[in-house]
């Protein structure tokens, strides 16, 4: 019975996905994913990216966010990206394939950042979803805590943090933690984000000293 429910849910998701206007637009424009449109909407309202910036992109594959940010930071900017999945090369993006939860991968990522002053850390990481919130939400919260840990390690004073979070247990505490570290925190739900999805994007700017 559970398998039937899962297959019905998967079929519905696939049907929604391939008829989604943002998926169709992404294909038409030659973009890597519909996530490009989410980031574009956030950039229009929050102006996170400027020419010459150094940006860390966590959960980067297939590359929609990195593809967008390259257009905003220009040739003098730099993106250090990481994902457990492979990603086709993008000019201006230094990509590391590996599991961000692995200490050796984290160490390698920090080495690539080096002494660079990172102005933005962004995370679109998500676990493999089972469809059961009691299982999925804790896994998601673990990833976003790791992303916040990366901010503590590399983000310059005044820098910004953009993170996808699934609303559920632990969300309010996480939001309070971010508010203690940044001067301004907003919650965004871009139009390109599916309405019934629990995902929201926390936009935190002005990292405190």
From Swiss-Prot:
Q: Where in the cell is it found?
A: Cytoplasm
- What catalytic reaction does the record list? uridine(2552) in 23S rRNA + S-adenosyl-L-methionine = 2'-O-methyluridine(2552) in 23S rRNA + S-adenosyl-L-homocysteine + H(+)
E.C. code: 2.1.1.166
Record-annotated active site: 164 (proton acceptor)
Cellular component terms (Gene Ontology) = cytoplasm
Q: A Pfam family for this UniProt protein?
A: FtsJ
Q: What class of enzyme is it?
A: transferase
Tell me its family. Answer: Belongs to the class I-like SAM-binding methyltransferase superfamily. RNA methyltransferase RlmE family.
PANTHER family from the xrefs?
Answer: RIBOSOMAL RNA METHYLTRANSFERASE, RRNA METHYLTRANSFERASE 2, MITOCHONDRIAL
Biological function = Specifically methylates the uridine in position 2552 of 23S rRNA at the 2'-O position of the ribose in the fully assembled 50S ribosomal subunit.
Protein known as: Ribosomal RNA large subunit methyltransferase E
């Amino acid at each position: 019975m559970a398998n039937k429910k899962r297959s019905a849910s998967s079929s519905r998701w696939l049907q929604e996905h391939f008829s989604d206007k943002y998926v169709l637009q992404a294909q038409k424009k030659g973009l890597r994913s519909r996530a490009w449109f989410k980031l574009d909407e956030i950039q229009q309202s929050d102006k996170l990216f400027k020419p010459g910036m150094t940006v860390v992109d966590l959960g980067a594959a297939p590359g929609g966010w990195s593809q967008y940010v390259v257009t905003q930071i220009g040739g003098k900017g730099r993106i250090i990206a990481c994902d457990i999945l492979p990603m086709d090369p993008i000019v201006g993006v230094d990509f590391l394939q590996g599991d961000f939860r692995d200490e050796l991968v984290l160490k390698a990522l920090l080495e690539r950042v080096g002494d660079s002053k990172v102005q933005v850390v962004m995370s679109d990481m998500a676990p493999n979803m089972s469809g059961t919130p009691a299982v999925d939400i804790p896994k998601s919260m673990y990833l976003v805590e790791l992303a916040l840990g990366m901010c503590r390690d590399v983000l310059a004073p005044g820098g910004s943090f953009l993170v996808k979070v699934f609303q559920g247990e632990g969300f309010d505490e996480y939001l309070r933690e971010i508010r203690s570290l940044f001067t301004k925190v907003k919650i965004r739900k871009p139009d390109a984000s599916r309405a019934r999805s629990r995902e929201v994007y926390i936009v935190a700017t002005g990292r405190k000293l």
